[in-house]
């Protein structure tokens, strides 16, 4: 007798007539007049539960089995048999059922066997992984993360762990969470009356990182190809379906790579991970296509079989201006494209994923390489049908004098970035990279509309529960 995951039973990896033990939670129980109960037991290893067939001859049938309700935890031992019923190929003829944990009050159990609204599930985020929806999201999230690691490993990249606490603002936007151990009731002040951060833990102002990019560049300029993958933080007071205060970012960085290399890497990466989900999580994707977004599977299949289009920002603006469509946000050269503009380009004009490149320098970060025209930078956004921007990246500015000039234009103190500038002083090279918001990727794959529902415990303005 061996303990096996439910997935092994349902997917035929356990021989018929083999005695096994499965451990999990009750999804449903139904009883027949013939003295047989049917337990649907899930353990999270796959989408479907396994059916355990329990005869009333078991010694604890009346006292325990007949009192099992949704959410109770059980250990079921029995033989794997071919299932005569529809819906699954195999079931377990139970010879023993142990109750590991009861649900205290089935009538008030928050995850009772019924469909709950997505808003309600956010209020019980500690229990929502027990639902079909969030369980499927969690498995897809895992598969995407593993596929990203696998892709970069196969491509010869090194994974670099960049710091979560930083004194640098990568985006230059100032929307950062401060990290401090100062006594808020008795803040030290300097001669100018300002908070004296010399007295703080790090001896200077410190923040939670908005990006691992700058640190990642230092390792790319030594190991050639690296990526970072971890949590990042933005103190944007944005209560939208696309924003989180804490989210995960994937950021590759490649030495000796230009913008075209960057675009090719982004395309190869996305197609690789989408194929992985289609192959490895067919059960969960079937659920998303049936219950969340009927186009979920077809969208990914189209994506992986379609070549990316490319267009300069200037031409993209011209396309939008002459398309005849009235947009909520006006279009003109110099404006940052909004989601409606991005989706029009990807869904209606190109009908394919599209890389928009060479944006006006005024709307992009200081580290992006200035183009020869002096007006645009070698930036790119990858736009996906159905969501808009899914990746943002650029070729980095490797020329020290140009980098210093851009910092001055944006009011940044170059001394704060002395170590970043050193990369341009000692063996500088062209290099490129991009950022992928992991939760937006999961939302795109699953069809789930709000990024709060694709991360275990969402952090948003005025919400840091659990």
From Swiss-Prot:
Database matches in InterPro entries: Aa-tRNA-synt_II, aa-tRNA-synth_II, aa-tRNA-synth_II/BPL/LPL, Asn-tRNA-ligase, Asp/Asn-tRNA-synth_IIb, NA-bd_OB-fold, NA-bd_OB_tRNA
Enzyme class: ligase
Entry annotated with the keyword Ligase: yes
Known catalytic reactions: tRNA(Asn) + L-asparagine + ATP = L-asparaginyl-tRNA(Asn) + AMP + diphosphate + H(+)
Assigned GO CC terms: cytoplasm
GO biological-process terms attached to the record: asparaginyl-tRNA aminoacylation
Record GO terms (molecular function): asparagine-tRNA ligase activity; ATP binding; nucleic acid binding
EC number(s) given by UniProt: 6.1.1.22
Top-level taxon: Bacteria
Disulfide bonds: none
Pfam families reported for this sequence: tRNA-synt_2, tRNA_anti-codon
Protein family (similarity comment): Belongs to the class-II aminoacyl-tRNA synthetase family.
Name used for this protein in its record: Asparagine--tRNA ligase
Provenance organism: Salmonella choleraesuis (strain SC-B67)
